[in-house]
């Protein structure tokens, strides 16, 4: 039986991931030694192997204790908690930040609103590195929801942001819940435009394919 494989029109690296890979290669050439990234820069074995061939290795945060003063650590596109950057710097490590600019924007908005007394609500996956990192910019105090269950005891003064890869439908659903319950709301739709384009591309592909991965 003949099968045709169709590649989605907008498949490939997103801007943030490509930028992080480019930054890693740039810093390896600049420092001329191993570069350590906090977690894999990308979930693609071919690219991971290419990076390792160029002295760029993924480690877990717990492995940072075994690094030496002057070693170079790269923050990947997902970003990390503010405290992680401080801890790594305090260890004498050279920290280079390749957090996606869109994620950095969320982190700074969360930090500012938290300092202004807003309760932070993040729409996204509580176990995703990006969300874990964002939560760290408000002292790990955010309410995190994936929209599958209704929020309870929503505070009167809230700041709402989204994981960059969240579905627009989920964002709208959660925001509608919050609007009904809160009196003062600052909402930033921080879904990456590339995510929206890719989701629409997959929807179009599903109309002509029997199976979508």
What are these regions (language model features)?
Residues 1-212:
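The feature marks the mature, well-folded catalytic cores of soluble enzymes
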